[in-house]
């Protein structure tokens, strides 16, 4: 069987207890390069560790190759842990992986992870909702699969809630320009956070 788990964002100690237990018991762990490598120390000594290197801009494995690997390893028996940065279902392609497992008849379970979209602003002292200021928050990709900006900037600029762009540092100037062009005030409070949930976190 396959367990698809979120490792949490940033430092290793943000993984959930359920994720930690899965690490200790798995026979194979297929992990992203975004996770804190110290998490692998919790695995059994004989556990097979396979890095699939998913990172924006440099993928060592395609999503299709990862899907195939999950099915193949599950067919060999034992517990296969797919460990993903943050939460598997927040821009983590977890849905694509369970679709492949369903098609192959492979049983699976899911373990949520702490998502950077909420945890990183919190660690910077920024609430994503605040009474009287923001009654909603919206999580948006900072770039699409073909490295373009997302659509619907007119809606984002006028929604009135907190906007959280993930993986958007490279496109930051254009994101800001598009929001302003579509009606967002130039004096709207904003923050840019890098290396979130680590000792190197920086916010401006």
Spans of features found by a protein language model:
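Beta-strand/loop-alpha-helix module characteristic of Rossmann-like adenine-cofactor folds
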Residues: 1-2, 99, 107-109, 115-204
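Class I S-adenosyl-L-methionine
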Residues: 1-12, 17-114, 119
